[in-house]
Structure formats: C-alpha cells, structure tokens
C-alpha cells in the first residue's frame, strides 16, 4: 500500500520499491523517474507542484561502505619477494553493478569515475557457494584472482595478481562491511 498522509508543511520521505532490469542499467549514470500526483484526499493538489522526481540508487546485497585491509607483495617467477611488501588499509565504497556484482577500486586509488577504467575491478559473487570471481572493470591488468564472501560476517576475502609498471604483484585482502 503506497498511500500516505502528511500535515501541511511536513516533509515526507518514503522508500518505494522499484524493480528494474539491472543488466540494462549503467551503474555510473543517474536515472530519474518522474511521478505525478494524481489525486489527494482532503486537499487539492497544487497545480504547479504535482511531479515528484525519484532518484534511483542501485544497491545489492554486497554494495556499501567497507574497510579493506591486506598486503601487496611483488612476485617474480611465481615467488613472493617479501622485502617488497606493503600494507593496505583504507575505506572503500562498493558500487552495485548487477544483482551479484560490485565494483571495487584497486589499492588506494581515488574512487573517482575518471579512475575507474584503469583502477577498478569487478567482484562477482556466485550465490550458490559464495565464491568470488575477480575481473578487471576495463583496463586494470589482473592476471588471476578469486576469493569468498562470508554471508554472516558480510566480509570478502580476496586475492589477485596484477601487473604494474611491468612487474607482477599479489594483493591479499579482507574487506569488511562498515556497520555504521
């Protein structure tokens, strides 16, 4: 039931479930649905203000704000070079791409849309067994990777190999959803 009532001058905010075909939506674009007030009880609608603009925000079970912590290690001939290890601990926003996919920015890259092509990846969760497949968003040179998603803790555990300046690196990280 989507009926509502409010007093004169009261601000009303309500979430209305709208289901869309996410595979046909670009997560980086803004979509607005105009809704017109057709009728009201007790009052006359103001003729100039009868349209509501609804801004869509794509979310899924995995999207939201997280803290990523882990390590980056340089690899050579499939062996880690322990002396070339750096730590990673930064907040990240996972953007819903579709029902089972989120976009994650690599390392501590700025989460600006202009960086997405070269510095973002997709985490694709298999809902059957909660394994995670890692793929580049566009141009990030990921060689291989994988992981798991813990449904109860809302935590990703991932690893992936990537190339940077002609050298191979491995990231191992735990990504924990921010509860606040």
Question: Predicted regions span which residues?
Answer:
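Single conserved hydrophobic/aromatic residue that forms the stacking wall/gate
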Residues: 2-4, 8, 12
């Amino acid at each position: 039931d989507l009926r509502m009532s409010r007093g004169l001058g009261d601000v009303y905010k309500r979430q209305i479930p709208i289901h869309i075909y996410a595979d046909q939506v670009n997560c980086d674009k803004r979509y607005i649905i105009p809704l017109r007030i057709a009728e009201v009880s007790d009052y006359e609608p103001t003729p100039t203000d009868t349209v509501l603009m609804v801004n869509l925000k794509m979310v899924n079970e995995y999207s939201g704000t997280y803290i990523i912590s882990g390590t980056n290690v340089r690899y050579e001939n499939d062996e880690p070079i322990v002396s070339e290890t750096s730590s990673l601990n930064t907040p990240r926003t996972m953007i819903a791409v579709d029902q089972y996919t989120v976009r994650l920015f690599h390392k501590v890259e700025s989460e600006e849309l202009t960086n997405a092509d070269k510095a973002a990846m997709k985490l694709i969760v298999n809902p059957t067994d909660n394994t995670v497949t890692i793929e580049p968003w566009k141009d990030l040179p990921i060689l291989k990777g994988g992981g798991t998603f813990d449904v109860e803790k809302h935590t990703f555990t991932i690893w992936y190999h990537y190339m940077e300046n002609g050298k191979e690196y491995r990231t191992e990280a735990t990504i924990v959803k921010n509860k606040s």
